[in-house]
Amino acid sequence: MASVSKQATAIIDLDAIRHNFEQVKQRAPGSKVMAVVKADAYGHGASKVAQVLEAADAFGVARVSEAVKLRESGIGQPICLLEGVNDPEELNLASIYELQVVLHNWEQLELLAARGARRHVWVKVNTGMGRLGFSLEETPSVLQKLGHQGLLGLMTHLADAGDKRSVKTGQQIARITALADSLNVPGSAVLSIANSGGVLAQHHYP
């Protein structure tokens, strides 16, 4: 019996992507929006999606190579390396292409400190996701070593934001807000908290 193989086809509606982005902006009018386009915009085509989302305040990617491609395609907005940098070569490219860097661990912090590269840095805080980031207890020491010059802000990731019944989201928000209030961070530093679920389901906008 002959097998029939059908090729899967993805139809990308860029107008729909733009519409979705505009919905987020409307629901969070006082906040800046970072459009995450890692993994080739989840298979949608990072460069094309970034061009369509020209109103985004910044773009987030996982790897340096993704950021370089965006820059070389003409994207001028800030580009954030969500997984940070892990060796001197990546750090050098981050400097050349003016990329924002997220710090998750002490090894990354030591890399930046050893090379005096402390500009355009986010500090990731693990408030309950349990995946990446410094603990709440570690963060004050991280900021002390990093210094406040060039600190963009604190970042966390909501674990259950899409579940309106979850109490964990409120707990995570309370933890990072209390942490930020307790730290002597510059007024220019911001909090990056809400993913899409946080905006659409939880109505939380930072």
Residue ranges and their predicted role:
Residues 4-6, 39-51, 110, 114-120, ...:
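Active-site loop/helix belt of alpha/beta enzymes
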Residues 102-104:
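Ordered, amphipathic secondary-structure segments that act as subunit-interaction surfaces
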Residues 1-100, 118:
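A charged N-terminal "starter" segment
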